[in-house]
Regions:
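Histidine/acidic-residue-rich, glycine-tolerant segments that coordinate divalent metal ions
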Residues: 65, 87-89, 95-108, 114-115, ...
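Acidic/His- and Gly-rich active-site-bordering loop/insert found
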Residues: 4-109, 114, 118-139
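Metal-dependent amide/peptide-bond hydrolase catalytic core
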Residues: 217-488
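Conserved short loop/turn motifs at secondary-structure junctions
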Residues: 33-34, 143-147, 296-301
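A short small-residue
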Residues: 4-5, 23-27, 99-106, 195-203, ...
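Histidine-centered active-site/metal-ligand motif
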Residues: 29-31, 109, 113-116, 173, ...
């Protein structure tokens, strides 16, 4: 009988497939696509998965750009999550030190999702290698999850049961630190409010008009007063997406506004949402207009899993990282100058640790404060405080134990959703971070496959955290994914 392979040998598959994986990442960067419009990116990833021996299934949950690649059979079943959508208006030349759009107004990968999807494929390839060469029972599934940016694709997929058979899941995100992501996130709802009025000549017969634009402005004013009377941690954002027209001498008959409501728990978001709805109805009543709302999407808060986070931290610390060249360090320094210089905000990191550990962590981080690339591992954080953002990974974390890391793919201090981040998306720094993330995720999965008791411990922790009620999808039945910025 042939001998099996070790975890370290399985992880070599990430290095072996570096060429195809990096090429796929660059192809996705070259043709950026926004939420639920990622048809080229889907084709690139499905092609890669099929070449690597995965069974590809498309149109998951009825979403054209949601798909999976499966290898193996039986239990345990592990999910590896990948994203690939871009952000509107962030077109940028690769590895440029100046803000220079490739195509004015076109999208760009300002959150590194070209790397995120392919890095997760790399992890799936290594896990497949481990299962195959060891003749082990088990299933690894790569999930292509569209529309994370403003679309909450995973939330729709979770609502429709796509992740129900998973025993656990892992994912990652590009960033400027090597760190296990610890803590919760903000749940959110996104809604469009539309107002319908009556047009008239604004000077000759204004009394005949019913201004939909006035309704939007009154709604926004009402919400402004509401902010004082909601919990401190909540946030209400808005964008007027249609003012009705460009003619001030016309009473505007139509106007719409997009709202994003955030809070630490789904129940808190829902309560604020109902109050915002009342304000919208009141604005319509005051202006003699009609109001209709369209529920666009929602996502749940993240559920921490310390069992998995500790395993992921172990792999983060043990797996070797590629050193950076002098050329890479110089490029990171130069691009850092475009946003005020590279640095680690040590105080921002320290708030995530218990008081008894702060001094030791500060002593560890201090020598790295001015590093141009953060070539170190952040110690495992203690806090379970809520992060100041939202992610649809939250919905997966309610369904099965889930853990994620951030890996260095950019110069220290690079702002997210910036031209500088887009510029670095095809760099060798980015490729090295993507490969490292793939190994850390695969190593975490293999550790859990080798010790099934860890899977049970992680599941037990999840049950304790979510309670008897379990996962209640925040997106109502019948709501379908919506592309906010469709292709023109």
């Amino acid at each position: 009988m042939a001998m099996g392979i070790t975890k370290a040998e399985a992880l070599k598959a990430v290095d072996r497939e570096r060429g195809p994986v990096c090429e796929a990442s660059d192809r996705i960067w070259d043709q950026p696509e926004t939420a639920f419009q990622e048809f080229h990116s889907t084709d690139v990833l499905c092609e890669l998965l099929e070449k690597e021996g995965f069974r590809v299934e498309r149109n998951l949950a009825g979403i054209a750009t949601a798909f999976s690649g499966t290898y193996g059979s039986g239990k345990p079943v592990v999910g590896i999550l990948g994203e690939f959508d871009a952000l509107s208006g962030l077109s940028q030349e690769s590895e440029s030190l100046e803000k220079t759009a490739l195509v004015d107004g076109a999208p760009g990968h300002g959150c590194g999702h070209n790397l995120l999807g392919t890095g997760s494929v790399a992890a799936a390839i290594a896990v497949k290698e481990y299962l195959e060469k060891n003749g082990k029972e088990g299933t690894v599934i790569f999930f292509g999850c569209p529309g994370e940016e403003g679309g909450s694709g995973k939330s729709f997929m979770a609502r429709d049961g796509v992740f129900d058979n998973l025993d656990f899941a892992v994912t990652w995100h590009p960033g400027d630190k090597n760190v296990v992501s610890v803590g919760s996130s903000l749940a959110n709802y996104q809604i469009i409010y539309r107002f319908y009025g009556q047009a008239s000549h604004a000077a000759a017969c204004p009394e005949l008009g019913r201004s939909a634009l006035d309704a939007v402005e009154l709604m926004n004013t009402g919400v402004q007063y509401l902010r004082e009377h909601i919990i401190q941690e909540a946030r209400i954002h808005y964008a007027i997406t249609n003012t009705g027209g460009y003619s001030p001498n016309v009473v505007q008959p139509y106007s719409e506004v997009l709202y994003l409501i955030r809070a630490p728990k789904n129940s808190q978001v829902k309560e604020i949402y109902e109050r915002v709805n009342d304000i919208a109805r009141g604005a319509a009543l005051m202006t003699g207009t009609k109001m209709e709302l369209q529920f666009v999407k929602a996502c749940s808060n993240l559920v921490d899993n310390t069992v998995m986070e500790e395993i992921m931290q172990k792999n983060l610390e043990e797996i070797e990282r590629e050193p950076y060249t002098a050329e890479e360090i110089e490029f990171a320094r130069k691009i850092g100058e475009t946003f005020g210089g590279n640095h680690v905000d040590i105080q921002d990191v320290l708030v995530r640790y218990e008081k008894s550990r702060k001094a030791a962590v500060e002593q560890f981080l201090a020598p790295h404060a001015d590093d141009v690339i953060n070539d170190f591992i952040v110690p495992l954080m203690d806090t379970e405080e809520c992060l100041k953002g939202s992610t649809d990974v939250g919905d997966v974390s309610w369904v099965c134990p889930t853990a994620q890391i951030n890996a260095v793919t950019e110069a220290a201090g690079t702002p997210g959703h910036s031209w500088q981040m887009v510029s670095q998306g095809k760099s060798s720094i980015a490729h090295k971070g993507m490969q490292f993330a793939g190994k850390v995720m695969a190593g975490t999965v293999i550790d859990m496959l080798e010790k099934p008791e860890l899977i049970e411990e992680a599941k037990k922790e999840l049950r304790r955290r979510v309670g008897a009620e379990g996962y209640i999808p925040p997106i109502p039945e019948g709501i379908r994914p919506m592309a906010i910025n469709p292709k023109k």
